[in-house]
């Protein structure tokens, strides 16, 4: 069965985020996974709204894949801590979207 993979990374303040998330999205999809991509959420909501939605997506995911540079995102750091706290499986992606 395919894994449900949530992509975590920096969105706010990164003008390249759509390209980075799309690249990781396609990589995971090509591996046969179902991709949960927060870059596809509508714009214009408050950060707390996004976090609530993203944590629900993480709860539904089998695995959370972190993009390079996630540490510089307050939201992704919360997601990482949430994964650690709840025992969610995680992996770090390399610069190309490949596993490190």
Located regions from the model:
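Conserved catalytic or regulatory cores that recognize and/or transform ribose-phosphate-containing ligands
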Residues: 1-100
């Amino acid at each position: 069965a395919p894994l449900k993979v949530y992509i975590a990374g920096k969105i706010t303040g990164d003008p390249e985020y759509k390209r980075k998330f799309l690249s990781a999205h396609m990589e995971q999809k090509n591996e046969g996974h179902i991709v949960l991509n927060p870059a596809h959420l509508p714009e214009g909501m408050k950060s707390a709204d996004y976090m609530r939605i993203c944590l629900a997506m993480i709860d539904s995911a089998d695995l959370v894949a972190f993009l390079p540079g996630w540490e510089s995102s307050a939201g992704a750091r919360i997601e990482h801590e949430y994964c650690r706290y709840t025992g969610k499986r995680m992996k770090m992606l390399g610069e190309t979207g490949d596993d490190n």
